[in-house]
């Protein structure tokens, strides 16, 4: 479960078994976990986050998308 970024209370990561799916990240804070596709950026599941938090998370992803995609490709060898 590689962590690729931490911003404030949020941890951005993917699971080692995720390579069969389209490129995405999971976002965790406390007991909440959301999932966001990266190409294009699109919310898959909100995981209990509020709309305002999802908005913040999506803005973070927009600003770090390239680095997240690079981390995915480096890890999975794409």
Go through each PLM region and give its residues.
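A short, structured beta-strand/loop element
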Residues: 15-49
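C-terminal structural segments of small proteins and small subunits
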Residues: 49-78
């Amino acid at each position: 479960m590689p962590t690729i970024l931490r911003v404030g209370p949020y941890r951005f990561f993917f699971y080692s078994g995720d390579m069969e799916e389209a490129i995405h990240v999971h976002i965790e804070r406390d007991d909440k976990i959301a999932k966001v596709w990266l190409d294009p950026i699109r919310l898959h599941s909100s995981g209990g986050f509020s709309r305002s938090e999802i908005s913040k998370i999506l803005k973070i992803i927009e600003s770090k998308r390239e680095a997240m995609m690079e981390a995915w490709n480096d890890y999975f060898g794409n």
